[in-house]
Amino acid sequence: MAEAVERTDELVREYLLFRGFTHTLRQLDAEIKADKEKGFRVDKIVDQLQQLMQVYDLAALRDYWSYLERRLFSRLEDIYRPTIHKLKTSLFRFYLVYTIQTNRNDKAQEFFAKQATELQNQAEWKDWFVLPFLPSPDTNPTFATYFSRQWADTFIVSLHNFLSVLFQCMPVPVILNFDAECQRTNQVQEENEVLRQKLFALQAEIHRLKKEEQQPEEEEALVQHKLPPYVSNMDRLGDSELAMVCSQRNASLSQSPRVGFLSSLLPQSKKSPSRLSPAQGPPQPQSSAKKESFGGQGTKGKDPTSGAKDGKSLLSGLATGESGWSQHRQRRLQDHGKERKELFSTTTSQCAEKKPEASGPEAEPCPELHTEPVEPLTRASSAGPEGGGVRPEQPFIVLGQEEYGEHHSSIMHCRVDCSGRRVASLDVDGVIKVWSFNPIMQTKASSISKSPLLSLEWATKRDRLLLLGSGVGTVRLYDTEAKKNLCEININDNMPRILSLACSPNGASFVCSAAAPSLTSQVDFSAPDIGSKGMNQVPGRLLLWDTKTMKQQLQFSLDPEPIAINCTAFNHNGNLLVTGAADGVIRLFDMQQHECAMSWRAHYGEVYSVEFSYDENTVYSIGEDGKFIQWNIHKSGLKVSEYSLPSDATGPFVLSGYSGYKQVQVPRGRLFAFDSEGNYMLTCSATGGVIYKLGGDEKVLESCLSLGGHRAPVVTVDWSTAMDCGTCLTASMDGKIKLTTLLAHKA
């Protein structure tokens, strides 16, 4: 509690200084300096009592204890009255013992003279009035205990503990509860981190156990079947290579005088005709029939007459229990075929790179395997470069995905507020929904605008307020808790489209982008733009407005000519503003000087979305040309990286239906968002959000996670990291909003 009081005092000082209340600040400092409660510091209160005893100031000691009784002890229940009385008695005895030990009998006599009226009727003091007159009170059995060092230390510790418990149990004002909240938050974060590590450890253990279960089965299959090299590598051998392997094996067989039973049974369909020697001649019908009955069931389309063994070798092999061996062999070959097909369907590279543990006699070639690629559920890239099906560690775990379905038309904007607790969504019909998702998904406010709405932004300081930009030249301030419009201001009648709104992080102002009617929709502002290059090349203005007075402060200069600004974004402290325009130019404004610091042509066509990077040394932009580009803001026009994105990530977005129905929507909301550390980016796609890894050296963005869940193209995204778990929002053209909760893996 003492630490919380001290920090609160500092915050109050800072606030008074910020507001210019210097007289109040001086008065506060004076009262804090004379504070008898010492900021609820127990050690300072005990030190104050000891200092008063050391200077023999009995009156001040009595007054200070009376103040503590009146200010602190009076709040306790009656059952603690005996404890307080015992502490007071021990304090006065401690004072008397100190006067005797320092040979100040006059102070001891003064104590009894001033306290006699109060103490003479108390039984515990009747023996103490003779204390000043005893020659050696420390040897007296009645007082010897109080002169020991142990008793003095015990009293100080008891007083300290009593005050500590008292301060912990005291009701505190709301402003001091933040310390306990911080401690609880830190504790929850630590518990979350422990659970996170346990979760990833369990995942790794499950993966290891699965791998251990698969490995013995694969090894057993290889040991049992003893496949020769040309069978295990059949999937990557051509005809010429296969003929060479067969010829090599023919040479090895001619050198070996011993022929096994299994080799005599295996069909010879893959042998070259050159293997038949003139002395062998054609096979006997009986041997052909035997080969059909025992070996022909495993593989279809075999030629029983090609390359058969002589009758003597075959009959010597069939002499031992041919029926039992044939069934056992057929069962093993079928199991082997199933296992190879399963391995090939799981990962082709794993089976292709395996080497057989032993090369046995000739075996029946497996039938041709048709492998189907495993559709990735979350990862876009599956097996690693070495094969083996071992996936790289996923950066996120999807804890859950929920759907908000109260919109019935295409979403334009979907934004989480600063606290990460509420979401504001806007569709093309002018329906605004404010809803929460923690602990349950619930609509808090709903409103329908008579005029078309084009832009939406949360206020930063009062996060209950929404800024709504319309298509008729007005900006509305909407209170989400009172569920009403606080005010509506007219921006410009000649430039009715409010394309973008951005509120400064300090909450004092916001910027507003107003533009003339688009060339494709001069009358109906709700009609979607077709996204052709040059269709939005209309005049525009960028204005700065005061949030409190709702009055225009200034108009920014847009060089070389006024143009429609599509997107705006502030940096963390509001000193910089970046904008993307319909002419493909990115402009960086200094908000302290209120002027354009630099500008450069970034895209062919319009700039759809622009954001600052995590370290704010660069900005990212997505344009009509389908490029995702990173720019250095310290050098105008310096390109750090450039990537090409799919058309369903950049727009215009197209939703097709039956009978030639086709809906086209140009990007309005945010097209990409970053995680808390700026290492990953969430973008739109035709079936859901896609998360890419940033900062790599590759020329192509690495797709890490596909969120999915949508049946219509996703048109805007947002990523909130205010909570411990990240929350990804993806909104689509069918009015559905998916809320995906992610747990980030921390190394």
From Swiss-Prot:
Membrane topology: Peripheral membrane protein
The WD repeat ranges on this chain: 406-445, 448-488, 515-555, 560-599, 602-641, 664-702, 709-747
Subcellular location: Early endosome membrane; Late endosome membrane
Gene3D superfamilies the UniProt entry points to: YVTN repeat-like/Quinoprotein amine dehydrogenase
InterPro entries for this protein: ARMC9_CTLH-like_dom, WD40/YVTN_repeat-like_dom_sf, WD40_repeat_dom_sf, WD40_rpt, WDR91
Cross-referenced Pfam families: CTLH_Armc9, WD40
GO biological process: early endosome to late endosome transport; negative regulation of phosphatidylinositol 3-kinase/protein kinase B signal transduction; regulation of protein catabolic process
Extent of Low complexity compositional bias: 265-279
A single cellular component GO annotation: late endosome membrane
Keyword Repeat: yes
MF-aspect GO terms: phosphatidylinositol 3-kinase inhibitor activity; phosphatidylinositol 3-kinase regulator activity
Segments of this protein annotated with the region Disordered: 265-393
Keywords linked to the UniProt accession: Coiled coil, Endosome, Membrane, Phosphoprotein, Repeat, WD repeat
Source taxon at top rank: Eukaryota
First-listed, main subcellular location of the protein, grouped into a coarse class: membrane
Modified residues (Phosphoserine): S256, S288, S293
Spans traversing the lipid bilayer: none
Functional description taken from the UniProt entry: Functions as a negative regulator of the PI3 kinase/PI3K activity associated with endosomal membranes via BECN1, a core subunit of the PI3K complex. By modifying the phosphatidylinositol 3-phosphate/PtdInsP3 content of endosomal membranes may regulate endosome fusion, recycling, sorting and early to late endosome transport. It is for instance, required for the delivery of cargos like BST2/tetherin from early to late endosome and thereby participates indirectly to their degradation by the lysosome. May play a role in meiosis.
Subunit note: Interacts with WDR81; involved in early to late endosome cargo transport. Interacts with BECN1; negatively regulates the PI3 kinase/PI3K activity associated with endosomal membranes.
Similarity section: Belongs to the WD repeat WDR91 family.
Name used for this protein in its record: WD repeat-containing protein 91
